[in-house]
Amino acid sequence: TTEIYTLSLHDALPIYVFRVDLELRPEGNSGEIVNSLTSCEIYYQSWGRTWERQALIKARVSAGSENLGKEFFEMIEPFIYRKSLDFEAIEEIKSMKYRINKSLKGKHSKGNIKLGFGGIREVEFTIQAHQLLLGGRDKSLRVRDSLGAMKTLCEKNILTEEDHDHLREAYVFLRNLENRVQITFGLQTYLLPDNEADLAVLARKMRMLGDSQKSLADNLMKVYENHTRFVGTLFAEQFAEKEKREAAETFYGEGDRSRIGEEQFTESMLAEISLLPDPKRAYRL
């Protein structure tokens, strides 16, 4: 395994085969590179963190035994998706984004396609927050790809159709822009260039209109800023205040006991959770 990993990153190769981050394995650098299913289960159920749950939402088999992969996913599913309304995970997602913002402050914060305001991370965090919160009870939300998850959230009336369309358009744009930045400059970077000439090159690759270098660069930045402004605003609005979530969590247990409780929970308490624009309809679906 280590030999394959080293070969994939070998300097003699013209390009990277795969970029693999071994620190993402159980226990990070101190953990075994290869783990048994039992070891994985013990680790995730005992020490697994929210960011690992988020990462595993997107996990898939890329090589080796598909049956082993299926067994792993069946084993790990209860770790990713909890039966209870998981408001603690929402708090941790907010904390992670706060730490990212703090680390970027004054350093590559502007024009960071992935980690900056309204960037790719905020799109994914918005989607994954809904999946972690509600996926334990609704298996249809256990979708690996982000666009598919957005579609399901819209079908469940958890995202409005308008928000879904804007979010999808923004995500596709940002992913395409990220890919073109990396292809153009041959680097694993998420930063927009800080000069007009390179921005104009990117604008052409993004099929932007413009009759001059300046107009191309300006048009690219205008579209980028419109998308990130929408995503950043939605991300901020989608997270309810802590007190509202705690109130809903308190009522959650009561809502389990009877059909009457479910009616009360739907109409009164879910309305307090800003993650759900149409709580009553979403709950019935």
Segments (PLM) and residue ranges:
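Short, exposed "boundary/linker" segments that immediately precede the start
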Residues: 1-6
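A nucleotide- and high-energy phosphate-metabolite-utilizing enzyme signature
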Residues: 7-285
